[in-house]
Amino acid sequence: MSLRIYNTLSRELEEFSPLQPGRVRMYVCGMTVYDLCHLGHARSMIAFDLVQRWLKASGLAVTYVRNITDIDDKIIRRAVENGETIRSLTDRMIDALHEDADALGIERPTHEPRATDYIPQMLSMIGTLEKKGLAYRAENGDVNYAVRKFPGYGKLSGKSIDELHAGERVAVLDGKDDPLDPVLWKSAKPSEPEEVKWASEFGPGRPGWHIECSAMACELLGETLDIHGGGEDLQFPHHENEIAQSEGATGKPLANYWMHNGFIVTDNEKMSKSLGNFFLIRDVLKKYDAETIRFFVVRAHYRRPLNYSDVHLDDARASLKRLYTSLDLVAPQALAAIDWNDPYAARFKAAMDEDFATPEAVAVLFDLAGEVNRTQSPAQAGLLKALGGCLNILQDDPKRFLRAGTTLDEATIQAQIDARAAAKAAKNFAEADRIRNDLLAQGIVLKDSPTGTTWAAAQ
């Protein structure tokens, strides 16, 4: 079975065929770095980290670009509020972004361009659009894109221009021919810091949000990409405008496959800073380990909404413990490579090849864990660990993972286990039960077997 991807553009599952055999060019819209990242950002990063990992596991070479928006109205406002420079704020937030992403086990993209490093490319594309009659200079000094002059506008959202309305991220400014016309170049305002003003043939100013991605994607990956991704909230207007700009400038499709991840929701509302219902990645990491957060995300299909709550994260942690308990039974055999003809591996691959269906892939892991429990086969345990590696889970030491979270040190716990063994040998079963219950009250579960007693943190 070949890989199939749900293409937002066609609204169908399509067989994936890269432009260049064996190579994939993927661009994903990254963060606007005016504040710390929340779990909604984590979901997008994990989703496309998973995509690029599976593409690599499938034998493809991946060039993955995830941009950084480091010039934006929100960034300017926050820097002014803080009394710091734009560069100081964005450098600090980019460092924090990397700390959060690294903590979650997210691989760095091949390229992570900052918008401010690509101003010449943006100006060049704006100039091309103006020459083609797709951009116009407004009375207020801005340069706007004329959406009604691009025949395909609305094809990603599936609506005509007359059906579309100015969305929450479309600023309706003076001088626009149509409220939907995105700003390509924002003229400098006297009140704005000098560091956000670039010289250009259009006058001093800065780029609009949408043109940033169009120019960076073209510069780093070429005029047509294999995959363009981002959160579902970016379909309109951001990605719709990217298509209009890029295809208007080049005359070629911007991307052959469009992928969009679903929201993390709280109380059925999208998690966002504007709603104030967000949870910072680093705050959640104080309560839950990174692998639990990652597993919480990959248990759901990337296109579906994901409900955040402590209950769901607790359940994710308990489920991970079940898998690690199987790996703790027998030392996994190191595999040189996954045998995809193995029945479990074949099922896992079939799930991932069907639009990265991680819920079905995770179900295979639990079935395989049951097999490991029955057979205690090092080879099967090795396969479980290797398949988990495709999702970047199950790579920790099982004992370390199972024992994490307890406040007791190992020596104290072992002393209690030894005391319980002595009580049982003396047929003082009441004392043995007291020790077991005392440990349980402190979050320690004992497991007796013919070879001795082991322990783990309670689920």
UniProtKB/Swiss-Prot annotation:
Catalysed transformations (reactions): tRNA(Cys) + L-cysteine + ATP = L-cysteinyl-tRNA(Cys) + AMP + diphosphate
Cofactor note: Binds 1 zinc ion per subunit.
SMART domains: DALR_2
GO MF annotation: an example: zinc ion binding
Co-factor requirement: Zn(2+)
Any one Pfam family match given in the protein's UniProt record, by short name: CysS_C
UniProt xrefs under InterPro entries: Cys-tRNA-ligase, Cys-tRNA-synt_Ia_DALR, Cys-tRNA/MSH_ligase, CysS_C, Rossmann-like_a/b/a_fold, tRNA-synt_1_cat_dom, tRNAsynth_Ia_anticodon-bd
EC category name: ligase
Alphabetical list of NCBIfam families matching this protein: cysS
Protein name as it appears in the record: Cysteine--tRNA ligase
Organism phylogeny: Bacteria, Pseudomonadati, Pseudomonadota, Betaproteobacteria, Burkholderiales
Gene assigned in the entry: cysS
